């Protein structure tokens, strides 16, 4: 079979203006970037304010493995197949970060005959939104550092006299706004700034990957430009010497940060291999952020299409949980149905029968199954791994959403094992189960899946949140740990307990939680496979994201700045003699 790059490069593409017109966009509602992509103006929301909305489908997966489950392949394939059976469908997915592209995971445009094209344009830069987020974020960091420098240099009286600004009395030990870059770079996890003469007070700082920036979450959760401006103004950049918050509005930098992101708030329109529309917007990770594409993209697509297919990052304990408890809480747009992606490989890998350390991913345990024997029939391992799938089925169902299981077929899969798995799923709480061949067959490979999803979406969804706003932060943590993960309980560090009290006292106790934990286990420990039991979730820190509207709980050893492994993806990427990019995939 051809590589993803080969398939993408051979694709016959619609002109982007034709694609937009087919979706229902007017020429003036598209800001063109060549012939293959365009930003969508938010004025379309005003024009279609009274339009009946379509149905939202959320795609999630079992606990992820290094073998890949094909969630984006399924999202794109389902969108293509919905259009093929006469439904008007649009996909809404996140913009890939270049960190994973050059790291282990690779691109995020789908694959095979179910991908967004041109895939190299999607995976590298796109229309520059991530760069805009990085620049706006780092302007905030530069502004707080400069203010600290000038206030320390001049003192209160002289600073106010010379600058005409209020003295903020920034506590250098309480600067909460650090810097970001869109690469995996572990050496930037802990740094000192202000070293040397005349460079400002020295303080400890760090870099996060841009996908973890609160601005990325704001981009994904804003309803319009005015909402984004208000949210950026609420960003907590530091505390003063009295323990009070200093916001981006207090610093006077919120307007400039918003200006940098003024075009980034517009989703980017691209197409799949069969000419189905796809809106790409925002890129928060699901392990260290809320892991879903934007509310704005969904809102535009829902006013133009019968079905909108979106996805949450990683497994249902990660992106799907945050889709429900953060995104839907803020958007008010509940899904009509969910698709849960699995593979035979994933279930065997999640069987918990053996593990080893993957040499390419530091501190991540993966199944001790090489590429040869994981493809071989192994009924015992498959049955043991089914417990993980069944847990995810029940996890989705607890939100009142009908769930359709999609088995992403590989060429090496055993027909007997596929048949056993379908029978096992049909005996579970799932609405239905279908095998998807979208990777190898494109739109023709997911027709049955599309038909079953349509039937599931016609049932009455009884969506419900996992917890209400008004309960305490400690109660929310307990609910997420015990109900959301099946834990025996939750333990807070001394620092986390103090932060919970402080956040409540400052008036932020009503906010939802964003759990930052490993995606490689339902628990906090990546070595615990299958369906872990009798574990306690350790919360080491609570981080306020007042602009985004949630509080992040850092669990276990999760990092907000990834590192590159022994065999990073950039080793394969180059330019050929024709000037074409090669090695992406």
Swiss-Prot record:
Residues where ATP binds: 65-72
Reaction(s) this enzyme catalyzes, per UniProt: (6S)-5,6,7,8-tetrahydrofolate + formate + ATP = (6R)-10-formyltetrahydrofolate + ADP + phosphate
Disulfide pairings: none
Pathway given in the UniProt record: One-carbon metabolism; tetrahydrofolate interconversion
GO BP annotations, alphabetical order: tetrahydrofolate interconversion
Molecular function terms, GO-annotated: ATP binding; formate-tetrahydrofolate ligase activity
Keyword line: ATP-binding, Ligase, Nucleotide-binding, One-carbon metabolism
Top enzyme class: ligase
Domain of life: Bacteria
A Pfam family the protein falls into: FTHFS
Keyword hit for Ligase: yes
Record flagged with keyword Nucleotide-binding: yes
Gene3D superfamilies per record: Domain 2, N(10)-formyltetrahydrofolate synthetase (3.30.1510.10), Formyltetrahydrofolate synthetase, domain 3 (3.10.410.10), P-loop containing nucleotide triphosphate hydrolases (3.40.50.300)
Entry's EC annotation: 6.3.4.3
InterPro entries in the cross-refs: Formate_THF_ligase, Formate_THF_ligase_CS, P-loop_NTPase
Family: Belongs to the formate--tetrahydrofolate ligase family.
Descriptive protein name: Formate--tetrahydrofolate ligase
Organism of derivation: Shewanella baltica (strain OS185)
